[in-house]
Amino acid sequence: MRSLLLLIVILILGIKFYSIEFLATVLVISFLIFFHELGHFLAARSLGVKVEVFSIGFGKSLIEREFKGTNYRLSTLPLGGYVKLKGQDDMRPGFENLDKDSYSILSPLKKIYILFAGPFFNLILAFFLYIIIGNLGLNKLAPQIGNIAPNSAAQEIGLQKNDTILEINGIRIQTFDEISKHLSLDPLKILINREGKNLEFILTPKIGQGYNDFGQIVEKPQLGVSPNGTSTLVKHQGLESFKYAAQESFQASTLIIKGIVKLISGEVEAKNLGGIITMTEITSKAAQNSFTLLLFITALISINLGILNLLPIPMLDGGHILFNLYEMIFRRKVPQRTFEYLSYTGMAILLSLMLFATYNDISRIIGE
């Protein structure tokens, strides 16, 4: 009962200080982790492995029910969850159980199947969320010109404020963000709408400084225009929604992988690493803005969760997959002491990253 009261107090404080959007954040994160664990659960059950515990949240159990040999729980802290398979214990890396319904007796390939199912469910969930988003539509900046920079390519050919860019080299432009994706240093054919009339221009962009997706200053082709602030509802319906979902899933996955590489190489400063507070802030703002934007952020976080869990770090799914690949290739298991050492090292790395990300979040809040 005390645990239940603690959970209620946490939620009340969250709603009081962050409004109802805080509750939306808790639900989003809990749902994504639930879906991740559901992947492991279904994969394990499909191979006859006993799932001893399926918990939504961590900590003391608030509500639990036994069904077909599995203990289903709702635990105190809703930001997380886990499944406990018979014969697998992350806190005791060397633990094994040789019963016929145990994870321990499975072949490496079957273990990889179970391990990969969690991240895969996150990626599939994101794909279907993008399909829903495409059909509902998402408000984005319209490709309408606001300010025009002096001596820019746009000024030189006579583009004007409130012109709407319709096409670049025959490619339809729906949002302002799409403009930069189709620029090059070669002459471009640009179709615009000005006061109801379509006009065509030949323009060669100039090199200028701008920011990439990671906040780095880079040189790239520019028109020299900014948006006028008008928004437009962009929809991708029917079969087009599947193409949109595939593109968004691929772009988000690529962005995450590039971000990890840049973080490791030092191209992106470690202070940019955000944690649960940043995630809560972003999700809460999305919930305030619109339901579709909340779905978009949910899809992005789901892909993050899927990709990050595949990193080859012990204690993550990717680390366990790596151990099993080693066993498949070399026909022997990772030595027990090495396995335990790497597992505890992985645990320390993850804990350090969580603490560092939280420190960054708090420093950013204090700085504001």
Curated annotation (Swiss-Prot):
Bilayer topology:
Multi-pass membrane protein
Which residue spans traverse the membrane?
112-134, 291-313, 338-360
Q: What class of enzyme is it?
A: hydrolase
Q: Name one GO biological process term.
A: proteolysis
Q: Which residues form the active site?
A: 37
The question of whether RNA-binding is a record keyword is answered with: no
User: Which keywords does this Swiss-Prot/TrEMBL entry list?
Assistant: Cell inner membrane, Cell membrane, Hydrolase, Membrane, Metal-binding, Metalloprotease, Protease, Transmembrane, Transmembrane helix, Zinc
- The residues that hold Zn(2+) are 36, 40
Domain of life of the organism encoding this protein: Bacteria
GO terms, molecular function? metal ion binding; metalloendopeptidase activity
Cited Pfam families? PDZ_6 (PF17820), Peptidase_M50 (PF02163)
Sequence ranges assigned to domain PDZ in this UniProt record: 126-197
- SMART domains from the UniProt entry: PDZ (SM00228)
Q: Which SUPFAM superfamilies match?
A: PDZ domain-like (SSF50156)
Q: Give the family from UniProt.
A: Belongs to the peptidase M50B family.
What is the protein name for this chain? Answer: Putative zinc metalloprotease Cj1068
